[in-house]
Protein backbone atom coordinates (compact mmCIF):
# COMPACT_ATOMS: atom_id res chain seq x y z
CA UNK A 1 0.00 0.00 0.00
CA UNK A 2 -0.95 -0.24 1.17
CA UNK A 3 -0.47 0.29 2.85
CA UNK A 4 -7.86 6.66 7.62
CA UNK A 5 -12.63 9.61 10.70
CA UNK A 6 -16.15 10.11 11.13
CA UNK A 7 -19.28 11.68 9.79
CA UNK A 8 -22.39 9.87 10.95
CA UNK A 9 -22.51 7.79 14.08
CA UNK A 10 -22.13 4.14 13.30
CA UNK A 11 -22.83 0.94 15.11
CA UNK A 12 -21.28 -2.45 14.62
CA UNK A 13 -22.76 -5.94 14.81
CA UNK A 14 -19.90 -8.40 15.04
CA UNK A 15 -21.15 -11.95 14.53
CA UNK A 16 -18.22 -14.27 15.14
CA UNK A 17 -20.16 -17.48 14.85
CA UNK A 18 -20.69 -17.10 11.13
CA UNK A 19 -17.90 -14.61 10.54
CA UNK A 20 -20.21 -11.92 9.16
CA UNK A 21 -19.78 -8.34 10.33
CA UNK A 22 -22.10 -5.49 9.43
CA UNK A 23 -21.42 -1.78 9.65
CA UNK A 24 -24.51 0.37 9.22
CA UNK A 25 -25.49 4.00 9.70
CA UNK A 26 -27.62 4.28 12.80
CA UNK A 27 -30.17 6.95 12.04
CA UNK A 28 -30.60 8.10 8.50
CA UNK A 29 -29.55 4.72 7.28
CA UNK A 30 -27.60 4.45 4.14
CA UNK A 31 -27.37 0.87 2.90
CA UNK A 32 -25.39 -1.29 5.31
CA UNK A 33 -21.78 -2.02 4.54
CA UNK A 34 -20.94 -5.65 5.16
CA UNK A 35 -17.66 -7.42 5.53
CA UNK A 36 -17.04 -11.05 6.23
CA UNK A 37 -14.67 -11.91 9.04
CA UNK A 38 -12.55 -14.90 8.02
CA UNK A 39 -9.72 -13.94 10.36
CA UNK A 40 -11.55 -15.17 13.45
CA UNK A 41 -12.49 -18.60 12.01
CA UNK A 42 -8.84 -19.05 11.02
CA UNK A 43 -7.78 -18.42 14.61
CA UNK A 44 -10.55 -20.62 15.99
CA UNK A 45 -9.32 -23.50 13.81
CA UNK A 46 -5.79 -22.84 15.05
CA UNK A 47 -6.86 -23.02 18.69
CA UNK A 48 -9.10 -26.05 18.22
CA UNK A 49 -6.34 -28.08 16.53
CA UNK A 50 -3.47 -27.08 18.82
CA UNK A 51 -1.22 -30.07 19.43
CA UNK A 52 -2.35 -31.98 16.35
CA UNK A 53 0.00 -32.81 13.44
CA UNK A 54 0.61 -29.96 11.01
CA UNK A 55 -1.13 -31.74 8.14
CA UNK A 56 -4.31 -32.12 10.18
CA UNK A 57 -4.22 -28.50 11.30
CA UNK A 58 -3.72 -27.21 7.76
CA UNK A 59 -6.56 -29.40 6.49
CA UNK A 60 -8.83 -28.08 9.24
CA UNK A 61 -8.09 -24.47 8.31
CA UNK A 62 -8.67 -25.18 4.64
CA UNK A 63 -11.98 -26.92 5.33
CA UNK A 64 -13.21 -24.11 7.56
CA UNK A 65 -12.24 -21.26 5.23
CA UNK A 66 -13.20 -23.01 1.99
CA UNK A 67 -16.70 -23.47 3.39
CA UNK A 68 -16.96 -19.69 3.72
CA UNK A 69 -14.93 -18.45 0.72
CA UNK A 70 -13.77 -21.17 -1.68
CA UNK A 71 -10.43 -20.55 -3.32
CA UNK A 72 -9.14 -17.98 -0.85
CA UNK A 73 -6.07 -20.12 -0.20
CA UNK A 74 -4.89 -21.68 -3.49
CA UNK A 75 -3.99 -25.35 -3.53
CA UNK A 76 -0.31 -26.21 -3.33
CA UNK A 77 2.58 -26.99 -1.04
CA UNK A 78 3.67 -23.36 -0.91
CA UNK A 79 0.34 -22.20 0.48
CA UNK A 80 0.25 -25.12 2.92
CA UNK A 81 3.68 -24.10 4.19
CA UNK A 82 2.49 -20.54 4.78
CA UNK A 83 -0.66 -21.77 6.56
CA UNK A 84 1.50 -23.92 8.81
CA UNK A 85 3.76 -20.98 9.62
CA UNK A 86 0.74 -18.80 10.39
CA UNK A 87 -0.70 -21.44 12.72
CA UNK A 88 2.61 -21.64 14.56
CA UNK A 89 2.81 -17.86 14.90
CA UNK A 90 -0.71 -17.66 16.31
CA UNK A 91 0.18 -20.29 18.90
CA UNK A 92 3.12 -18.14 20.00
CA UNK A 93 1.46 -14.72 19.98
CA UNK A 94 -2.03 -13.80 18.83
CA UNK A 95 -2.66 -10.61 20.83
CA UNK A 96 -1.74 -8.21 18.01
CA UNK A 97 -3.78 -10.25 15.55
CA UNK A 98 -6.78 -10.20 17.88
CA UNK A 99 -6.39 -6.46 18.34
CA UNK A 100 -6.41 -5.94 14.57
CA UNK A 101 -9.63 -7.95 14.29
CA UNK A 102 -11.18 -5.90 17.08
CA UNK A 103 -10.07 -2.53 15.68
CA UNK A 104 -11.17 -3.20 12.11
CA UNK A 105 -14.94 -2.55 12.39
CA UNK A 106 -14.66 0.95 13.88
CA UNK A 107 -11.78 1.85 11.57
CA UNK A 108 -13.72 0.74 8.50
CA UNK A 109 -16.86 2.59 9.56
CA UNK A 110 -14.82 5.73 10.24
CA UNK A 111 -13.03 5.46 6.92
CA UNK A 112 -16.30 5.06 5.01
CA UNK A 113 -17.92 8.00 6.82
CA UNK A 114 -14.96 10.25 6.07
CA UNK A 115 -14.69 8.97 2.50
CA UNK A 116 -18.32 9.84 1.83
CA UNK A 117 -17.58 13.49 2.51
CA UNK A 118 -15.82 13.62 -0.86
CA UNK A 119 -17.66 10.72 -2.51
CA UNK A 120 -21.19 10.79 -1.04
CA UNK A 121 -22.54 8.04 -3.25
CA UNK A 122 -19.79 5.57 -2.42
CA UNK A 123 -20.65 1.93 -1.77
CA UNK A 124 -18.10 -0.82 -2.14
CA UNK A 125 -18.53 -2.50 -5.53
CA UNK A 126 -16.78 -5.60 -4.18
CA UNK A 127 -17.48 -7.89 -1.23
CA UNK A 128 -15.05 -7.12 1.61
CA UNK A 129 -13.27 -9.84 3.59
CA UNK A 130 -10.98 -9.64 6.62
CA UNK A 131 -8.73 -12.69 6.67
CA UNK A 132 -5.31 -14.07 7.57
CA UNK A 133 -3.28 -13.19 4.50
CA UNK A 134 -0.39 -15.56 5.34
CA UNK A 135 1.93 -12.55 5.16
CA UNK A 136 0.82 -11.61 1.64
CA UNK A 137 -1.08 -8.30 1.96
CA UNK A 138 -2.52 -5.73 4.29
CA UNK A 139 -5.17 -4.84 1.74
CA UNK A 140 -6.06 -4.96 -1.92
CA UNK A 141 -8.39 -6.45 -4.48
CA UNK A 142 -7.86 -9.86 -6.05
CA UNK A 143 -9.51 -12.48 -8.23
CA UNK A 144 -10.37 -15.88 -6.77
CA UNK A 145 -10.92 -19.17 -8.53
CA UNK A 146 -13.15 -20.89 -9.38
CA UNK A 147 -15.26 -18.30 -11.12
CA UNK A 148 -12.84 -15.39 -11.40
CA UNK A 149 -14.57 -13.72 -8.44
CA UNK A 150 -13.38 -10.17 -7.74
CA UNK A 151 -13.09 -9.46 -4.01
CA UNK A 152 -11.57 -6.93 -1.63
CA UNK A 153 -9.25 -8.52 0.91
CA UNK A 154 -7.81 -7.07 4.12
CA UNK A 155 -5.13 -9.06 5.92
CA UNK A 156 -5.47 -8.93 9.70
CA UNK A 157 -1.94 -10.27 10.12
CA UNK A 158 -0.29 -7.44 8.18
CA UNK A 159 -2.70 -4.85 9.53
CA UNK A 160 -1.38 -5.94 12.93
CA UNK A 161 2.18 -5.48 11.67
CA UNK A 162 1.85 -2.16 9.85
CA UNK A 163 -1.32 -0.42 11.09
CA UNK A 164 -1.71 -1.18 14.79
CA UNK A 165 -2.05 2.54 15.51
CA UNK A 166 -3.58 5.69 14.04
CA UNK A 167 -2.63 4.64 10.51
CA UNK A 168 -5.39 2.03 10.18
CA UNK A 169 -8.21 4.34 9.17
CA UNK A 170 -6.05 6.34 6.71
CA UNK A 171 -4.89 3.07 5.20
CA UNK A 172 -8.50 2.00 4.71
CA UNK A 173 -9.29 5.33 3.02
CA UNK A 174 -6.38 4.65 0.66
CA UNK A 175 -7.85 1.28 -0.26
CA UNK A 176 -11.42 2.56 -0.53
CA UNK A 177 -10.18 5.14 -2.99
CA UNK A 178 -8.82 2.39 -5.24
CA UNK A 179 -12.32 0.91 -5.37
CA UNK A 180 -13.87 4.26 -6.24
CA UNK A 181 -11.16 5.11 -8.79
CA UNK A 182 -11.62 1.79 -10.60
CA UNK A 183 -15.10 2.92 -11.67
CA UNK A 184 -13.42 5.32 -14.09
CA UNK A 185 -9.80 4.24 -14.55
CA UNK A 186 -8.76 0.77 -15.73
CA UNK A 187 -5.66 -1.12 -14.65
CA UNK A 188 -2.94 -1.03 -17.30
CA UNK A 189 0.68 -2.08 -17.42
CA UNK A 190 2.51 1.21 -17.99
CA UNK A 191 4.44 2.71 -15.09
CA UNK A 192 2.47 5.95 -15.27
CA UNK A 193 -0.81 4.02 -14.81
CA UNK A 194 0.16 2.36 -11.55
CA UNK A 195 1.92 5.51 -10.35
CA UNK A 196 -1.26 7.47 -11.08
CA UNK A 197 -3.44 5.01 -9.19
CA UNK A 198 -1.24 5.12 -6.10
CA UNK A 199 -0.66 8.87 -6.39
CA UNK A 200 -4.37 9.58 -6.26
CA UNK A 201 -4.92 7.16 -3.37
CA UNK A 202 -2.30 8.98 -1.29
CA UNK A 203 -3.70 12.35 -2.36
CA UNK A 204 -7.22 11.25 -1.39
CA UNK A 205 -6.04 10.38 2.11
CA UNK A 206 -4.10 13.65 2.39
CA UNK A 207 -7.17 15.58 1.23
CA UNK A 208 -9.61 13.86 3.57
CA UNK A 209 -7.16 14.00 6.49
CA UNK A 210 -5.33 17.32 6.08
CA UNK A 211 -3.28 16.81 9.25
CA UNK A 212 -2.19 13.29 8.31
CA UNK A 213 1.40 12.39 9.08
CA UNK A 214 3.68 10.62 6.65
CA UNK A 215 3.08 7.49 8.70
CA UNK A 216 -0.66 7.79 8.13
CA UNK A 217 -0.05 8.43 4.42
CA UNK A 218 2.00 5.20 4.20
CA UNK A 219 5.11 7.21 3.34
CA UNK A 220 7.35 5.57 5.92
CA UNK A 221 7.21 1.92 4.81
CA UNK A 222 9.69 0.30 5.03
CA UNK A 223 11.50 3.53 6.05
CA UNK A 224 10.80 7.26 5.67
CA UNK A 225 10.42 8.12 1.98
CA UNK A 226 9.96 11.90 1.77
CA UNK A 227 13.37 13.23 2.87
CA UNK A 228 15.30 10.44 1.16
CA UNK A 229 13.48 11.14 -2.12
CA UNK A 230 13.88 14.91 -1.78
CA UNK A 231 17.64 14.40 -1.55
CA UNK A 232 17.56 12.59 -4.92
CA UNK A 233 14.60 14.45 -6.39
CA UNK A 234 16.12 14.99 -9.83
CA UNK A 235 17.01 11.32 -10.10
CA UNK A 236 13.47 10.33 -9.10
CA UNK A 237 11.89 12.65 -11.66
CA UNK A 238 14.19 11.53 -14.45
CA UNK A 239 13.58 7.86 -13.69
CA UNK A 240 9.82 8.28 -13.93
CA UNK A 241 10.15 10.40 -17.07
CA UNK A 242 12.40 7.85 -18.77
CA UNK A 243 10.12 4.93 -17.89
CA UNK A 244 6.76 6.72 -18.02
CA UNK A 245 5.28 4.44 -20.67
CA UNK A 246 7.28 1.30 -19.87
CA UNK A 247 4.95 -1.70 -19.76
CA UNK A 248 7.34 -4.19 -18.17
CA UNK A 249 7.14 -4.75 -14.44
CA UNK A 250 10.74 -3.78 -13.64
CA UNK A 251 10.18 -0.03 -13.66
CA UNK A 252 6.97 -0.30 -11.65
CA UNK A 253 8.72 -2.50 -9.09
CA UNK A 254 11.60 -0.05 -8.82
CA UNK A 255 9.31 2.89 -8.14
CA UNK A 256 6.53 1.37 -6.06
CA UNK A 257 7.42 -1.93 -4.42
CA UNK A 258 9.37 -2.91 -1.36
CA UNK A 259 12.53 -4.66 -2.47
CA UNK A 260 12.03 -3.29 -5.99
CA UNK A 261 15.63 -2.13 -6.42
CA UNK A 262 15.08 1.60 -6.85
CA UNK A 263 17.80 3.47 -8.74
CA UNK A 264 20.67 5.57 -7.49
CA UNK A 265 20.08 5.66 -3.77
CA UNK A 266 16.34 6.29 -3.85
CA UNK A 267 14.28 4.60 -1.12
CA UNK A 268 11.89 1.72 -1.67
CA UNK A 269 8.45 2.95 -2.75
CA UNK A 270 9.73 6.44 -3.63
CA UNK A 271 6.99 6.58 -6.27
CA UNK A 272 4.31 7.00 -3.60
CA UNK A 273 5.79 10.31 -2.50
CA UNK A 274 6.61 11.43 -6.04
CA UNK A 275 3.07 10.47 -7.01
CA UNK A 276 1.59 12.61 -4.24
CA UNK A 277 3.62 15.58 -5.46
CA UNK A 278 2.53 14.84 -9.03
CA UNK A 279 -1.17 14.71 -8.08
CA UNK A 280 -0.85 18.00 -6.23
CA UNK A 281 0.97 19.56 -9.21
CA UNK A 282 -2.09 18.99 -11.42
CA UNK A 283 -3.94 21.74 -9.56
CA UNK A 284 -7.12 19.64 -9.67
CA UNK A 285 -9.07 18.40 -6.67
CA UNK A 286 -9.24 14.71 -5.89
CA UNK A 287 -12.90 14.36 -6.89
CA UNK A 288 -12.16 15.62 -10.38
CA UNK A 289 -8.96 13.59 -10.68
CA UNK A 290 -10.77 10.43 -9.64
CA UNK A 291 -13.20 10.71 -12.56
CA UNK A 292 -10.60 10.87 -15.33
CA UNK A 293 -10.41 7.81 -17.53
CA UNK A 294 -7.10 6.50 -18.87
CA UNK A 295 -7.17 8.58 -22.05
CA UNK A 296 -7.87 11.80 -20.15
CA UNK A 297 -5.49 11.06 -17.28
CA UNK A 298 -2.26 10.51 -19.21
CA UNK A 299 -1.82 14.06 -20.56
CA UNK A 300 -2.63 15.51 -17.15
CA UNK A 301 -0.16 13.20 -15.42
CA UNK A 302 2.45 13.95 -18.08
CA UNK A 303 1.94 17.73 -17.77
CA UNK A 304 2.20 17.57 -13.97
CA UNK A 305 5.43 15.60 -14.23
CA UNK A 306 6.80 18.10 -16.75
CA UNK A 307 5.95 20.93 -14.34
CA UNK A 308 7.81 19.21 -11.51
CA UNK A 309 10.77 18.68 -13.82
CA UNK A 310 10.81 22.34 -14.85
CA UNK A 311 10.59 23.47 -11.23
CA UNK A 312 13.51 21.19 -10.36
CA UNK A 313 15.52 22.37 -13.40
CA UNK A 314 16.36 18.83 -14.44
CA UNK A 315 18.09 18.29 -17.78
CA UNK A 316 16.48 14.97 -18.75
CA UNK A 317 13.65 14.81 -21.28
CA UNK A 318 10.00 14.76 -20.30
CA UNK A 319 7.81 11.90 -21.59
CA UNK A 320 6.40 12.25 -25.09
CA UNK A 321 3.20 14.25 -25.41
CA UNK A 322 1.61 11.73 -27.75
CA UNK A 323 -0.26 8.94 -25.97
CA UNK A 324 1.37 5.54 -25.90
CA UNK A 325 -0.73 2.47 -26.62
CA UNK A 326 -2.06 1.33 -23.27
CA UNK A 327 -1.83 -2.34 -22.46
CA UNK A 328 -4.83 -3.16 -20.32
CA UNK A 329 -4.51 -5.75 -17.60
CA UNK A 330 -6.97 -8.57 -18.07
CA UNK A 331 -6.82 -9.91 -14.54
CA UNK A 332 -6.82 -6.69 -12.57
CA UNK A 333 -3.65 -6.74 -10.53
CA UNK A 334 -4.19 -6.28 -6.82
CA UNK A 335 -3.65 -2.75 -5.55
CA UNK A 336 -2.49 -3.00 -1.90
CA UNK A 337 -0.92 0.28 -1.01
CA UNK A 338 2.44 -1.32 -0.69
Give, region by region, the residue ranges found by the protein language model.
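Pan-zinc metallopeptidase signature
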Residues: 236-327
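Sec/Tat signal peptide C-region and signal peptidase I cleavage site
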Residues: 23-29
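N-terminal mature-domain "stem" immediately C-terminal to a signal peptide or N-terminal signal-anchor/transmembrane
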Residues: 29-84
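Bacterial N-terminal signal peptides
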Residues: 11-23
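Small-residue-rich helix-loop
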Residues: 218-237
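Acidic/His-rich structured neighborhood in mature extracellular/periplasmic domains
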Residues: 85-223
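Bacterial N-terminal signal peptides that target proteins for export
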Residues: 2-14
